[in-house]
Amino acid sequence: MTLDSTMACCLSEEVKESKRINAEIEKQLRRDKKDSRRELKLLLLGTGESGKSTFIKQMRIIHGSGYSEEDKKGFTKLVFQNIFTAMQSMIRAMETLKILYKYEQNKANAQVVREVDVEKVCTFEQPYVNAIKNLWSDPGIQECYDRRREYQLSDSTKYYLTDVDRISKPGYLPTQQDVLRVRVPTTGIIEYPFDLENIIFRMVDVGGQRSERRKWIHCFENVTSIMFLVALSEYDQVLVESDNENRMEESKALFRTIITYPWFQNSSVILFLNKKDLLEDKIMYSHLVDYFPEFDGPQRDAATAREFILKMFVDLNPDSDKIIYSHFTCATDTENIRFVFAAVKDTILQHNLKEYNLV
């Protein structure tokens, strides 16, 4: 065998090996591509306090491992802090709104609660329990609570304050509902992946306050579905960041921006009109027409009000070919979210069958 033929033989072996390696790489790339397509990215968007974090908690309860006793213990301090934060907000509002306490001793109780550094709260003991119970039962504080649209107050206030006896018992362990109701503003980006029918759903929650939104841009690649949350009950409220701007108008402006982004051209859009329970309560005394004069439906009618709000959002869609899927929700109601997400999952899978190699 000549040197040339030996070299040719070696070369052909090298070429063969190179081809084999390339083929293996190509095969792996195709496999990776197929696997990556079995992961669906769901982006949760909406303004602050629309219920995005509660929705993520529900996914953990419904499709994940839920909350163990140890997990729930971790929320104890946050529940206590939520109670103090709510009462301090109302005490400040009593002054701003010039509402008087009916019972003189509640001025002293208010002072006791006001002096607490909420960040350092990790227990809930006397004299604070009594002070908060007495304040909550004062007609002045109740009037202040009824006027909560005039200042910032957590939606969970009534839920916690009517249950102070249970929450202040020694050895208190938060219930699942207590965990769902805890308010902690989202800063940064929270991802929650869960597995459904061999497909990974990666839900991404980003902070809704204006200061958080500049971080969203990093999440915009390869989004399967936009899940946009609107709080139905915010039609008469103003922003935390700006007390002369209506929260629902802000939500509409954000939704209009999101659905026209080129990034989301191929993403399905699912609109959750959340806090339907709070709307049903609020619509009885706060009239939609006072904030949206174009509303010409009957007063105290939650069904008409929510359909009007839905239409306002759907009408913002400039693309007649793009369907906006919508659901009325109550994010603190596990059974409601279980039912709604089953429908959402079907929508997402139908929308992505071919694209994600699921057929």
Swiss-Prot record:
Residues 329-334 are annotated as: G5 motif. CDD domains: G-alpha. It catalyses: GTP + H2O = GDP + phosphate + H(+). InterPro entries: Gprotein_alpha_Q (IPR000654), Gprotein_alpha_su (IPR001019), GproteinA_insert (IPR011025), P-loop_NTPase (IPR027417). Residues 270-277 are annotated as: G4 motif. Its main location: membrane. Keywords: Cell membrane, Cytoplasm, GTP-binding, Hydrolase, Lipoprotein, Magnesium, Membrane, Metal-binding, Nucleotide-binding, Palmitate, Transducer. One of its GO terms (cellular component) is heterotrimeric G-protein complex. GTP binds at residues 46-53, 180-183, 274-277, 331. Residues 38-359 form the G-alpha domain. Residues 201-210 are annotated as: G3 motif. Residues 41-54 are annotated as: G1 motif. GO terms for molecular function: G protein-coupled receptor binding; G-protein beta/gamma-subunit complex binding; GTP binding; GTPase activity; metal ion binding. Disulfide bonds: none annotated. It is found in: Cell membrane; Cytoplasm. Mg(2+) binds at residues 53, 186. It comes from the Eukaryota. It is a lipid-anchor. It holds the Pfam family G-alpha. Guanine nucleotide-binding proteins (G proteins) function as transducers downstream of G protein-coupled receptors (GPCRs) in numerous signaling cascades. The alpha chain contains the guanine nucleotide binding site and alternates between an active, GTP-bound state and an inactive, GDP-bound state. Signaling by an activated GPCR promotes GDP release and GTP binding. The alpha subunit has a low GTPase activity that converts bound GTP to GDP, thereby terminating the signal. Both GDP release and GTP hydrolysis are modulated by numerous regulatory proteins. PANTHER family: GTP-BINDING PROTEIN ALPHA SUBUNIT (PTHR10218), GUANINE NUCLEOTIDE-BINDING PROTEIN SUBUNIT ALPHA-11 (PTHR10218:SF328). Belongs to the G-alpha family. G(q) subfamily. This is Guanine nucleotide-binding protein subunit alpha-11. It comes from Xenopus laevis (African clawed frog). The lineage of its organism: Eukaryota, Metazoa, Chordata, Craniata, Vertebrata.
